[in-house]
């Protein structure tokens, strides 16, 4: 692998690639808010960059993902590195009218693992953000989570979504809908820490996180309610994350102030005060967010937190705009992580 961008083994640079040293100027750091009402100004929250962030797209023949990465390039904060079948990728770019845009192409022969190729680029230092493209979640995550591939840190990798719901007054974080299938108590702590850190990257000082359960009462017949109580108790005595925890709490009490009133549930954050939801397991989180997308016309973005670099991970059926939002999310996480490393 080469030592600096965009020199990458087996790379094909598009005709529109910028000359060395000819990268555009990047926006000044936007004003951070304590609460994000929606996604409207998320790109403006990206701190000023010395250069565009090199996004390594694993599987470069997915239409909306390719659209999204080039929209992010147009917004001025990424440099696309497309990893996949060159012929299919270029045919797609020509069909989308993007063939003359600046990008770097890494050709991967059919049958070879595009995710492994993408990870190798990141490991070499030639990538800032890893992105899942047109490959299944399973085939993407297996090499990502493989310790021998060097993406692991001392933190557990978990997925954090940001969701804009029409009836909720601000963006809502949700975790984990992708990585940890049935989290243990210790894994739930890691999910909570990563979710809190993701919100802190946006300027939240003490995120309010709800521990979702079917019911708000603790019952030994439902292990997640017992674990929620233990997590809240431990957080109050020996904090393990920079956040405020509340739970166990049912979904209606998180979302609706009226539901809390009717149930005589005394919670100051019901109906719009919570910043994030921690689901009891992956299935619950995944079903919840897909229900929001289909029935509530929600808008989402998502990233894997806790890896060596931020990882943009959205559904392959997600709109191009959601891909761009996920890359903005990753850019903000990357800036925050680097700031923490220097502290």
Over which residues does each language-model region extend?
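Short, low-complexity intrinsically disordered segments enriched in small and basic residues
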Residues: 1-7, 11-25
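Anion-binding alpha/beta catalytic cores of soluble intermediary-metabolism enzymes, centered on
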Residues: 30-270, 275-343
